[in-house]
Amino acid sequence: MKHLFVSILIFCSLLANNLNERVITIGGCVTETVFALEMGQNVVAVDISSSIPNKVTQLPQVGYIRGISTEGILSMNPDKILTTTEMGPPKVVQQLKDAGINLKIFNAPKNYDDILSLIDDVATFLDVSKKGEQLKSELIELNNQINELKLDKPKIVFFMSPALGSYNAAGSGTRADYLINYIGGENIFTNDFKRYTKVSKEDIIKYNPDIILTGYVRELNKKEVVDIFKNSDEFQSVAAIKNNQLYGVSVGEVLNFGPSFVNTSLNLIKKINTVE
């Protein structure tokens, strides 16, 4: 009986410590995955790219994932930091390790399979493997639907937060390029440049995309980034405008490569397929 009592005390002590842990998540994919696994109760701060679920936008922010400061992190007194290989600069990563903080660095996802791997890794680290398997099963089912409904290679362009007269398009090697291919499209600029590059209105008209995707960061900007093309006389000859195939997409949902990427991609395909 005495041994049982001691064991219960130890278990309760460990449970209390876990409940009181202060966790910082850096990287939108990591933050979203932690919360999707229902383990976000101890998260006390996030980075700027973390926007899903919406409630994390109310948490203190520790900066941009590639430009984190040691002081900003340490001021939050974290017990654990969960991040990806995109975190930097390297000297800050080393300083945090030297400070004795439990810093867990996951591989940054680059595709659908990587998203599943990240779920596995985070779930294992947080000791919730069963929840991880359940979440993966849900995404696998959604991915199966995507494979059945995939688009038939329409010409697509993705613009990051476009403004009037400023069209920043995704080239090859970008997550937007992967998104376009994932839903069954072809990026009109994939053979022209890598990363993001500003293109002219003449380029857009010449390539005549079937579908235009406009990435927005804040929901209130969704209509604004769409109207730049929709209400412009200069683009009325473009197939995407004529056929009402112009969509605002949340950058957090489609470019952070968290669990919501799959469902958002499926919903986008369904919207495109329902337009007559």
Residue ranges and their predicted role:
Residues 21-76, 80-86, 188:
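A short, structured surface patch at a secondary-structure boundary
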Residues 62, 67-83, 101, 200-217:
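Proline-aspartate-enriched helix->loop->beta-strand connector
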Residues 91, 108-120, 155-175, 223:
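Extracytoplasmic ligand-binding site segments that recognize negatively charged/polar headgroups
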Residues 47, 173-196, 216, 248:
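His/Asp/Glu-enriched short active-site or ligand-binding loop at hydrolase and phosphoryl-transfer sites
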Residues 3-14:
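Sec-dependent N-terminal signal peptides
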Residues 21-22, 114-124, 133, 144-149, ...:
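Structured C-terminal subdomain patch of bacterial secreted/periplasmic proteins
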Residues 52, 90-121, 125:
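Flexible loop/hinge segments that line or gate small-molecule binding clefts
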Residues 19-35, 131-183:
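Basic- and aromatic-lined ligand-binding clefts that recognize polyanionic substrates
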